Amino acid sequence: MTLYQKYETDNAYNYLQQIIDLLEEPICLLGGWAVFFTVNELYKKETGSDYLGSKDIDLGFHIDMNFKEQQLKNTTMGKTISLLEKNGFQSQGSRYYKDISIENGRELTSEESKNEPAHNVFKMYIDLMVDNVHPSFRKIFNFDPLDEDLLNLVFEKTTMRTEITTFKKLLWIPAPEILLSTKIKSLPNRTEDKRIKDICDIYAISFFSNKKVTELMKESKILLEKDRFEKLKPFLESDDDFLTAAEHLLVDGESIKNLFKELIKT
């Protein structure tokens, strides 16, 4: 049983390499691929398999609230948007995408995509997220950005990020406690496949990163308001999601449920 189809994660990984090659260092990587690079070494040592990949690419950007409009255009965010557009990615708000043929992996033009059966088209998404929403952002870039205030810590404090060299580029990856906190925040609003992936990620970060689970839980409770953990309580009403996540993680479903019980404790 697979969470995502192999062509989805393979395509995303290939495009991740291409995008990283285009961008200026350091590159802040978020989401599922950030979790992958955080946990994969220990996870593979424990299970013999690579950790779950992602079907999307998530990138983070610092926005200085004091920037003038021209400075905003010249930020890493602005340069990234220009590069994506020059390389054929289409805008869908804060998401950029390409349509890919599932049959042969070929990039499709807009016209070709319209003429293809929907089941033969995979949308390769790149999500752009900022730490601060500049008042002129929409005027300059014509969309409202996704924002995450915890990203401020990643850009401000070296202790809140892990710096790795991958694909010959310097990547900044949020520290495990930041990744865990963002997953806890996003989980209650997720639809099925994303929900299961977030549960997997919460467990993997807790047990396969370079920090002890007790330390991570303590730090996440400093970073997040109490109500964020309260919103996890409905997940304890059924074992279904935990059992599904356990199949993907190659672990016991009860251990995932027990982790959630500990997270919910005040």
Language-model region placement:
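Compositionally biased terminal segments of proteins
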Residues: M1-T266
